[in-house]
Amino acid sequence: MARRNKGRDISGWVLVDKPAGLTSTAVVNKVRWCFDAKKAGHAGTLDPDATGMLPVALGEATKTIAYMSDDLKAYTFRVRLGVSTKTDDAEGEVLETSDTRPTDTEIEAALPAFVGDIQQVPPQFSAVKVDGERAYDIARGGGEMELAARDLYVESLSVIGRPDADHVDLEFVCGSGGYVRSIARDLGQVLGCFGHVLWLRRTWVGAFDIEDAVGLDRVEALARTDALYALLQPVGLALHALPELRVTDAGAARLRNGNPGGVLPGNVEYGDLAWASLNGTPVAVGRYRSGELHPERVFNL
């Protein structure tokens, strides 16, 4: 029997402007097929109905996803005031309604409570695990559960538009684990009018901006052609939050073999997590100690 082709060794980031109606995993699988890549992943799940920035990692770029966990993410979204739903978005069954509509001043006054280090309860329809089962599976089966509040850092929450009395547009910048649907739900409760997300768009993740993203249709149109390579962003972009240390050829060779390698002087302290580069190409991520980088993750680039 002929051996199945496992794909090509392609490494880099593809910044996809995710369309509504697809899961993040489905987008990753499509991109992987288009590039015929061996390995693929993504940095941060978007709900199926959400659009916007979905950074897709190919090959060695998948090793950098873990170092993006502290990256901030930005979202714009519209809240429908006066209605709560089972899913906290427009797809869910309506639970409660209210004729109350807050003023612009009341909305602005409520926002500071959602900024800083806060506690947030995930939506019932979320990927949070409860006794080994996904919350959304329990919810779809008609079950209800009390989900524990989680720590969340929120950089900012601000009004960017008020189309009419029933709607308000917001921008939300947060750390890992934030749920926009929970913000809409909780803001509606604080304002005494209920609320849910009408639409949601992610505009940036860490160093990745939606202005640099391409539509999935563009990726599919170029599938299995050399023109796709022009869409690849460097692997090292995901390491922007870590100090970069340059290495010599000899140091790079040691690091690639999993051994501590000498690095050139840089803005780093003993024990800091940093990444080593040779001519701008990532070699390894590790801890800096006395002129050497002790590798924790090595790149085959």
Curated annotation (Swiss-Prot):
The active site is at residue 47. One of its GO terms (molecular function) is tRNA pseudouridine(55) synthase activity. It comes from the Bacteria. Gene3D superfamilies: Pseudouridine synthase. Its EC number is 5.4.99.25. Keywords: Isomerase, tRNA processing. Transmembrane segments: none annotated. One of its GO terms (biological process) is tRNA pseudouridine synthesis. Responsible for synthesis of pseudouridine from uracil-55 in the psi GC loop of transfer RNAs. HAMAP family: TruB_bact (MF_01080). This is tRNA pseudouridine synthase B. It comes from Jannaschia sp. (strain CCS1).
